[in-house]
Amino acid sequence: MNLAAMDPQTYDAQLEHKRIKLEQAFAQFETPSVEVFASEPANYRMRAEFRMWHDGDDLYYYMFDKVLNEKVRCDQYLPASVLINQMMSALIAELKPNPSLRHKLFQVDFLSTLSGEILVSLLYHRQLDDQWRTNAAALKAKLSSQFNVNIIGRARKQKIDLDKDFVVESLQVNDKTFLYKQIENSFTQPNAKVAVKMLEWAIDVTQDSQGDLLELYCGNGNFSIALAQNFNRVLATELAKPSVEAAQYNIEANGIKNLQIIRMSAEDFSDAMAKKRSFRRLEGIDLDSYVCNTIFVDPPRAGIDPDTLALVQGYERILYISCNPDTLKDNLEQLYKTHRVTQFALFDQFPYTDHMETGVLLERR
């Protein structure tokens, strides 16, 4: 974290610097001009994590400033959603005078939504007992007069849900509303308004698609649910069990009838498609019946492994969302041999940082 860089007055200049840097880095691939999707300059993060500092009777949130090499008190946090900032103030006022809730509390995580829900996770260096549960329930009841809130307690090998461990986000994407179950301690897009722009861009660049869609690394179904309208059928893979369960919930909540999720890694799915191995999880699924002219990938920061990249390269159209321009560039070194870049986008998920979320559409030469 670099607090000095978090100045809304300099946001536009910082974003322009990212655009120039991105275009220069990918010039060898003859990309079209970068389409830039800006963030709000403040209150854009829907989740945040803070360490807790105990100083006598005082208790406060802090983060570590890597530039100053010191901890910085955070009574409010400019990047965090308005809802998180409101909860920060209300929560700390309740924790300070409560010995049971503050004892050995070392971290607080917030997960908020545009739909008005917020989940608060309290992390401890001690085991949680019945007294903690009673006090946490009273805390939830008091906060519920102001917030649509749920509270989770965590300690080593222990997790206590007072009600539920997820929120349901509601995103307005073009003329449709999509509901997404987001589970505590699982990956979600941190910048909801930019996430909407990403979905709208992906829908737009695939709107004339033919056949079916294959998606790897689908998470909670964020993209596949929104893109299902553009394809006959969608087949998606995801390895993390909580994400697969959330995806199944989201499919039903959004009434999607043409999307099937398979719980397996991209690497294993590549082996299955190449008929190198058979998998019990694929019993009853006729992979050969899918006519996937388009593949969608949103890999982790490490990018796509060589075997999966070879699979991806076999498709006519490749829609690639990347959270790491360096590994995207490495993957494009291979993909560019057979495909050309027809769409290029920068999504500013992480203002005031060097991180860049990008989108690329490739079509076979």
UniProtKB/Swiss-Prot annotation:
Task: State the active site.
Answer: 323, 357
Q: Which InterPro entries match?
A: MeTrfase_TrmA_AS (IPR030390), MeTrfase_TrmA_CS (IPR030391), SAM-dependent_MTases_sf (IPR029063), TrmA_MeTrfase (IPR011869), U5_MeTrfase_fam (IPR010280)
Q: What cystine linkages occur within this chain? A: none
Could you state a single Gene Ontology molecular function term?
Answer: tRNA binding
One GO location term (cellular component): cytosol
Known EC number(s)? 2.1.1.-, 2.1.1.35
Q: Which residues make up the binding site for S-adenosyl-L-methionine?
A: 189, 217, 222, 238, 298
Under catalytic activity, the entry for this protein gives:
uridine(54) in tRNA + S-adenosyl-L-methionine = 5-methyluridine(54) in tRNA + S-adenosyl-L-homocysteine + H(+); uridine(341) in tmRNA + S-adenosyl-L-methionine = 5-methyluridine(341) in tmRNA + S-adenosyl-L-homocysteine + H(+)
Which residue windows are coiled coil? Answer: none
Q: Which UniProt keywords apply?
A: Methyltransferase, S-adenosyl-L-methionine, Transferase, tRNA processing
* Class of this enzyme: transferase
Q: Which Pfam families match?
A: tRNA_U5-meth_tr (PF05958)
Q: Which GO terms describe its biological process?
A: tRNA methylation
Q: Which family does it belong to?
A: Belongs to the class I-like SAM-binding methyltransferase superfamily. RNA M5U methyltransferase family. TrmA subfamily.
Q: Write out the function statement from the record.
A: Dual-specificity methyltransferase that catalyzes the formation of 5-methyluridine at position 54 (m5U54) in all tRNAs, and that of position 341 (m5U341) in tmRNA (transfer-mRNA).
Which protein are we looking at? tRNA/tmRNA (uracil-C(5))-methyltransferase
